Amino acid sequence: MSTFRDDIIRFLTDEGFIPGRDGLWPQVLSVAEPQRLILPVEICATSPQEAEAQARDTERIVLEIKEKTGQMPLIMTEDRWLRQTGMMKARLLAHLGRHMQVYARNCEVRRIEKGVAAEFLGRCHSYGDAACRYRYGMFLKRHTGHLAAEGMGQALEAGTLVAVATFSNARKWVKGDKVIRSYEWTRYASLPELRVSGGMGKLLRAFIEEAEPDDIMSYADLEWSEGAVYEQLGFAGEADKEAVMFRVDPRTWERVPLRAGAREEEGTIPGTGRNLFFMNFGSRKYRLKLTEYPSE
């Protein structure tokens, strides 16, 4: 029987890469050129307890890899691969250096409608759309970048929507003698086959110019990133958010959070008689303070 891991190996081989089994971690795939480690994570747990044990084992492997190689492996989960196949394949190739490159200076930012943002995020963000107040799109004005590898097809046309960022409405609270307006950066995504150099920063500046926030917070999904890009933008890490337990529908591979304190049977998928569970790796909270105010 073909496995999820076999599917990744077959895809990489068809794309001209030579994936092999890593000598230290049998679960991990190694690609020599460029040197990258890929960690496939199957969705096979039939109870929350089993999913938690699997998550702890995955975290252990990731930590060992980081300690020995200084490299964060690319984590590929089975549900994402099967539910968002095109996006995940493009992301995988991009991490291996096969992507198109454009520069934010050759793009313009403008507000976009709810439907446009939702459609783009549905295709390009792991968690799709989310409730928000502000929606911005980055559109290509002219393409003066390059293809990072051959075989990427035609350059994008002027006017192409290449990235989207969304922000919440303001939350207000009193800090000392100031009323602070704090916003959440809820989503950012670019076309998965694309690298937009300076894209996040340009979208952030557009929001700051319009909303004039005192404070912006966001979360880095530790399944994908440890948040270095937020630090480059001036955000400071605050705390890690606990991992979330999901049930996964094996027919559609959709994740649904299992609410805290729920009984295991409440995660049952109607008509299947089978439960699958996955525990993610949590997230890291970041904050950008644009107005000085006391922390307490």
For the regions a protein language model found, what residue spans apply to each?
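Hydrophobic beta-strand scaffold residues
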Residues: 19, 72-74, 237
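A short catalytic or substrate-binding loop motif that flags glycine-/basic-rich loops and adjacent residues
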Residues: 21-23, 128-132, 277-281
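Active-site beta-strand-loop-beta-strand hairpin of nuclease catalytic cores
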Residues: 27-37, 181-183
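A conserved beta-strand-loop-helix scaffold within acyl/acetyltransferase catalytic domains
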Residues: 87-91, 96-214, 220-228, 232-233, ...
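Acidic-basic catalytic patches of nuclease active cores, encompassing PD-(D/E)XK
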Residues: 1-22
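Short beta-strand-loop-alpha-helix junction that forms the active-site gateway
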Residues: 33-58, 170-171
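Active-site/acyl-donor-binding loops of N-acyltransferases
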Residues: 219-293
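Catalytic cores of nucleic-acid endonucleases
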Residues: 51-83
